[in-house]
């Protein structure tokens, strides 16, 4: 049950102060203690699997009874495989090199001083997210390993799951001798707590929101604390005239149908007009075969090619202008015939969300132009957009994905939760 808190402002001030105090201790914690805490949490959660999954079932049942959106239900669900992947991510973070204290760019200046840069924690991270109970553990593990304290505010739909996971995070911190307030999962679903968290400039150094476009837009507008974010994931796959047909089909099917409720799912398929007559029907048939619920929203040129295809009956409709700007998070795919590489790049940079975009081609010069000129956090050649993920990038896990250009861009792992400070060694030098 949600804890009733009468004075949200006072509660959040207390949470913030505890986090700031804990952040100073965590910044000085050694790698061994941080890894020990992560592995203790791993073992305890492994033993508590049935308890965690039972808590998630409560959330899922409540979500269904409240008619929660299908994409949110998908994100909310914890099954055996997702639970194991969540735990593996924890072990992967423990195995990563500790970035804190790393010194780079050491150089001597003519004055005699020696200077360089040292990697340090950001301090206190505030995380606001919907569904996805795995984010509770991923964010906590990344914050802990990078020496940050973190305040986690999950959605009300995942309250039982998050609290069950939080219990073992707290236990692991205590057993490892680290501050118990290093990871705090808010014990309220009162939305006023979000408003307080994003304005706690005295205690919080950065906010990371993960959720729907409305949530992130609101936080970006109202926050007084810096925000690391992406608004949505309108990801494209461009099938170039020099594409390998087998790769084009395989990647397109995976990019669209692997999972719908993720920000790295393909939402628009662009096909070069030079190969559209031959290849588009094969791709469309394969995507529809992978999911009979698929709806293809077509521009005029692609409709001309596909409208008489018996295998696609009932799956076709006309695209509107808004389709090119839409993240569906559903079995819906916008399809457009495009006049070559220049038009593809222009379409993506105009309508995309600067998240992840893909070219399928065997032409090296075209691929290099695409990755240089497409203005996205991740740009891929001959691979599914579903790879745009901290785990797949070798980050162990990710606290989020940023489409901003300042501080962090793309999947945000350990280094994204750090900054660098200048360090100077002297021998009594003075400025003349």
Curated annotation (Swiss-Prot):
GO terms for molecular function: glutamate-5-semialdehyde dehydrogenase activity; NADP binding. This is Gamma-glutamyl phosphate reductase. Gene3D superfamilies: Aldehyde Dehydrogenase, Chain A, domain 1 (3.40.605.10), Aldehyde Dehydrogenase, Chain A, domain 2 (3.40.309.10). Its EC number is 1.2.1.41. One of its GO terms (biological process) is L-proline biosynthetic process. It is found in: Cytoplasm. Its main location: cytoplasm. One of its GO terms (cellular component) is cytoplasm.
């Amino acid at each position: 049950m949600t804890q009733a808190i009468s004075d949200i402002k006072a509660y959040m001030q207390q949470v913030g102060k505890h986090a700031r105090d804990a952040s100073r201790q965590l910044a000085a914690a050694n790698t061994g203690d941080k890894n020990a805490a992560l592995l203790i949490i791993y073992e305890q959660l492994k033993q508590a699997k049935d308890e965690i999954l039972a808590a998630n079932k409560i959330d899922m049942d409540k979500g269904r009874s409240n008619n929660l959106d299908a994409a949110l239900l998908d994100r909310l669900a914890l099954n055996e495989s997702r639970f194991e992947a969540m735990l593996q991510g924890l072990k992967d973070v423990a195995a990563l090199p500790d970035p804190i204290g790393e010194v780079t760019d050491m150089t001597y200046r003519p004055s005699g001083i020696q200077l360089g840069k040292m990697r340090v924690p950001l301090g206190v991270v505030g995380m606001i997210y919907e569904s996805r109970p795995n984010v509770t553990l991923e964010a906590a593990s990344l914050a802990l390993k990078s020496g940050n304290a973190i305040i986690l505010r999950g959605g009300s739909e995942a309250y039982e799951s998050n609290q069950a996971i939080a219990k073992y995070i707290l236990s692991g911190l205590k057993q490892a001798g680290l501050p118990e307030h290093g990871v705090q999962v808010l014990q309220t679903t009162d939305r006023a707590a979000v408003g307080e968290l994003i304005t706690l400039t005295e205690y919080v150094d950065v906010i990371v929101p993960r959720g729907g476009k409305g949530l992130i837009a609101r936080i970006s507008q109202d926050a007084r604390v810096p925000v690391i974010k992406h608004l949505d994931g309108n990801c494209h796959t461009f099938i170039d005239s020099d594409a390998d047909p087998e790769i084009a089909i395989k990647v397109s099917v995976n990019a669209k149908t692997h999972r719908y409720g993720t920000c790295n799912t393909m939402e628009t398929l662009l096909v070069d007009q030079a190969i559209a007559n031959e290849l588009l029907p094969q791709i469309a048939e394969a995507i529809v075969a992978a999911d009979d619920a698929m709806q293809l929203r077509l521009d005029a040129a692609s409709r001309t090619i596909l409208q008489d295809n018996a295998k696609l009956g009932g799956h076709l409709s006309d695209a509107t202008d808004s389709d090119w700007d839409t993240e569906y998070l559903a079995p819906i795919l916008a399809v457009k015939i495009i006049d070559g590489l220049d038009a593809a790049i222009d379409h993506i940079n105009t309508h995309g969300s600067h998240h992840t975009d893909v070219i399928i081609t065997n032409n090296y010069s075209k691929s290099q132009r695409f990755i240089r000129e497409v203005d996205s956090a991740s740009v891929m050649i001959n691979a599914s957009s579903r790879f745009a993920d901290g785990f797949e990038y070798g980050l162990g896990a990710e606290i989020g994905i940023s489409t901003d250009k300042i501080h962090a861009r793309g999947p945000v792992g350990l280094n994204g939760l750090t900054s660098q400070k200048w360090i100077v060694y002297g021998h009594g030098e003075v400025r003349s």
